[in-house]
Amino acid sequence: MKFHSASEDATSLVLTNYPDVVSIAKSGDLSADAWLIGSGSPSLKVIPSAAYIVLDSTAMTLASTHSFQQNHAIVITPHEGEARSLGFPINDPSERLPVALSMARSLNVYVILKGPATIIAAPNGLHSIDTHGIPELSTAGTGDVLAGLTASMLASWQPRSANEIVETLGYAVAAHGCAAAIAREKRNPITATDVLEALPLVFTEK
């Protein structure tokens, strides 16, 4: 895994806790199978090249302000409030699916619209709906776990077609929801770290 932050303090904190992570600030190597771009990134002057780019939090504005290469699969992960900020308001639960599809088509991105029933939508209209999520996933930081899981699964599975990409995103969302449910069995309320630490159990359960 490679990591970059404009903050030296943040970089130091990450490297102290995760010594296997490579700091781009030190290596200068921007090559990767997938990139996750998060908070504080709209000011980026150079967007790293990768087959898959996941935009989370304030970086989702890049979906409408940056011209990505056509062969890139761009994924955004908004909740309803963020969808509204991007210009796609949802005024009623019945509007979630049509708005997700409109967002995907208009921005030419894959959308993971988070919520009670998370919607995965592709630019060509393909979509799926996941119901594994639980209310506790509204806890701060759990969306970051989903974004990281999504990027890592895209990098690992290397889906090519729209159908394969939607399927991969669906697996990420389902695993995230199942991990939260496992974490809740141990304690409640749960934290984002609880969800992260429960993920290995999801992938080892039969």
PLM features: residue spans?
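Glycine-rich phosphate/dinucleotide-binding loop and adjoining beta-alpha-beta core of small-molecule
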Residues: 2-132
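Short, conserved aromatic-histidine micro-motifs
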Residues: 5-18, 164-183
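Alpha-helical scaffold segments in soluble metabolic enzymes
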Residues: 13, 49, 85, 102, ...
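Charged C-terminal helix
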Residues: 17, 177-206
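Short, charged, surface-exposed loops that flank catalytic or proteolytic processing sites
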Residues: 90-98, 158-170, 187-190
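Glycine-rich phosphate/pyrophosphate-binding beta-alpha loops
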Residues: 134-137
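Short, small-residue alpha-helix embedded
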Residues: 139-178
